[in-house]
């Protein structure tokens, strides 16, 4: 799948991810000179003093949530604001509060992982992250971050998803009748058996598990588990289950973050559902295919998608 990564979220250097364990996050005392105001879910007011940052990682839970504790292997959805604190000056670098919530999955900056693991869903967390817990002495020139810059994060934790999260609705079909058959147990990757028949010429959307959640709308951040296979060979070429964490994207974004078949086939589906998408080349990777994934230009693709959440 096409993926758009937040450049400030992922450690682009070869630094280790030094995460805390379950329970309350371990860190030094919060920096009293950085203050955060405003309600959960709204863009925060952040005051950063006109002086140099301290050298240690400092974390403060500004708003205490009452939801589940975020575990080390969880993916989680949140809103964030990021400031670059450079010497005695600072500036807002990125914010999702004016756009869409983001799925935090995979490797985070070491300091951010230390700050967020062990927090409860519904919390607002302030993290002042020194270079050693961010991008190191090299910085991140592409993002305008120098090796001496401190990063200030404010993160609202909206929802967490365990690594084995799956569809939660009512089973209505296993496919078949000219379409692939799908079998699996709850919390496990679906198994796809492709028939020997020719694939459909047009996009097919088949609900396998009917969820009871809200319908997906264009522009939302959608969180899913998925398996993708090639019709011709039945070979699985991609799966979020193998990576051990769900996948998040903005549906019907411009430019698109996923293949057209996903944008077309998932809008209107209910959260909690498992949906099979049979995607012809025109709604997949087009005339160029995707050689890295072993997809030829004329290949029809089969996806089984578990819709875990949709967020505006």
Regions found by a protein language model. Give the residues of each.
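Cross-family detector of peptidyl-prolyl cis-trans isomerase
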Residues: 2-312
